[in-house]
Amino acid sequence: MTTVPDVFDETLPHPVAPRPAAWAADRARLLGAWVAAGARAHRSSLVLLAVLLPVVAVVHGVNFDGWPGRVTDDEGTYAAQAYSMQYWNRIAHYTYWYDHPFGGWLLIAIYTKLTDGFHRAATAVTAARELMFLLHLVSCVLLYRLGRLLGLRRFFAGLALLVFSLSPLALWYQRMAFLDNIGVMWLLAAFVCAASPRRSVAAAALAGTFMAFSFWSKETTLLFLPGLYVLLWQHRDPRNWRFVRRNFLGCLLGICGIYILYAAAKNELFEGPGHVSLEWAVRWQLFDRAPSGSVLDTGSDTYNVVRSWLDLDPYLVLAGIAAAVPLLALRRLRVVSALLLMQFGFIFRNGYLPNPYVTAMLPFAALCAAGLLDAVLPRALPRMSTDHGGRDGDGERHGHGDGDGHGDAVRERGGGRGMPEWTTAAWTGLRRGAVAAAVVGSVVTLAWDWTPKIHKALTLDASAPSRDATRWFLAHIHDDGTVITDDIAWTDLTIHGRRPLPVWFYKLDLDPEVRGHFPHGWKDVDYLMMGKPPDSVLAEVPIVAEALHHSVVLKSFGNGEIEIRRVLPPGCRVDIPPARCGPGPDSVPARSGDGDAQRPASGRGHPGAGAGEPARDSGDPLRRRDGVLSPGGG
């Protein structure tokens, strides 16, 4: 006879005792002590940042929406794509064709979701620029930290921060809602982690992660990957280098690889009939995109772009490039100087040069310009310690653990064995005088050139025509006519309930699915709200060009910068409502009296959606093979 085992005789695990109530308080005290210790270690830098950041915040925050004006559609495009993500659960408001990874406008969408930006801010672009302001403050802290990790003294790291922020060239591009600003912030974070004095596996993993985030924001930042890897190698610890590089590459490739997996999951990895593809987009970006000419050709677009940079600020980038050449001999600054020279060299290739290209050059130019002054100014040899170089009162290492930090310090101190003391003193005094003269001369020159430009940035509202045009259109145009506009106003009109949905003028000609809703071409267009594009753009959008030719101006803003036009088919007058102005004998059906459009403008979105509410999807995204060129795009 079998017996049932007596389970009560078995040894059971003891129940986990609840943590005492004081456990949370102990953890909080430990965290507070850790923060306090870090603050004490970096007290000098924290005080300096507490002085510099408010200055940067005022200069970048005052009138950030007014200057620059709405000079490129790219800002509106990224805001519209963020709106599409937030309200339509789509990657883009039209077909996403892999022009850029979508991490940049995903971050904009997260910000606008958390802050109700699209309904709170004056315009959609304003909400996106708010995020650029916050990201710039983060970038300033990261730039300062990177300078300190690369051996710059506090004064020169702060100097790099100031020129990086106060340059009119920086103000122009860092205020605008460009993906480059997001990518640069993540890039600086990756460099800070790579140069971490801890040399830990976690720091390497963070460096790879932030580099991947930078790629997801702007794919061109992958050009900085070799420099990041070299910096990580320079600051390596031989004891864990194998694990460091594995974690760095694993995080980088794993997160970047999600982009390829996304395309593969949607069957859009390779080119095929009836759909976009990542392969086609990469090939177009690298090989098929029309070049903008040589920088040496005064009639080329590349020359005009570089000329516009120098008109804003002829000093920062050129000074950084000039300083980068001798800094190649200094190991601790070799990576940033080589990366700046690499970016400078790319300008001379016969390819496409986007306007915001200079954005990624600015932090490296600032570090090189300040780094050369730091290298020339003699410094005292650091006190030796058991941790490869010791620390100063700010908790920073003087050496870098690369076998060359002490040699750099000796060279920069100006000392040398066998030299007479009077010779060393004279050489030291000469170097100090040269640095002092350079700093004073730079302050005078930059103040003379930058002050009126910064004053303009703080006072001129160059965006008013665009905002006024949108307000006037919403207040005075109440019929359900189809409006063709730029992407700057697209989101604002959509948020305020304009139905049928407005159409971005580029899509009217270049997207076959959108063009299919305009069987009579320009005669199916009722309103235009945009400035006159240049002739080179009009050549790509003939339907828009014809609509402009057959239109009359209802209202003009900013001396013709933005015009609201009514398109008049043959036999129609401006006083006749669009519903009674058909395109001809074979006109489209008249619109119903309840405001629902029989002819939708974009094939998606419910025409009767209320003001400020997202339009409901009414089908699959538009599909096409051809890419859409975005003016001034990156």
Sequence positions of predicted segments:
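Aromatic/acidic, Gly/Pro-rich catalytic loop(s) in extracytoplasmic/lumenal soluble domains
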Residues: T2-V7, R515-G634
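Transmembrane-helix motifs of polytopic, lipid-linked glycan transferases
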Residues: T126, E130-G151
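Transmembrane-lumen/periplasm boundary regions of multi-pass, lipid-linked membrane glycan transferases
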Residues: S84, L225-A329, G351
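Transmembrane alpha-helix segments characteristic
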Residues: A50-V55, L159, G320-I321, L328-R349, ...
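Membrane-interface transmembrane helices that cradle and orient dolichyl/undecaprenyl
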Residues: L149-G151, L188-L206, S214, P326-L327, ...
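Short acidic/glycine- and proline-prone juxtamembrane loop motifs at membrane-interface regions
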Residues: L169-I182, P354
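Transmembrane alpha-helical segments
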Residues: S217, T428-D461
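Short periplasmic/luminal acceptor-recognition loop of GT-C membrane glycosyltransferases, typified by
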Residues: D99, W448-P452, K456-V514, H520-V537, ...
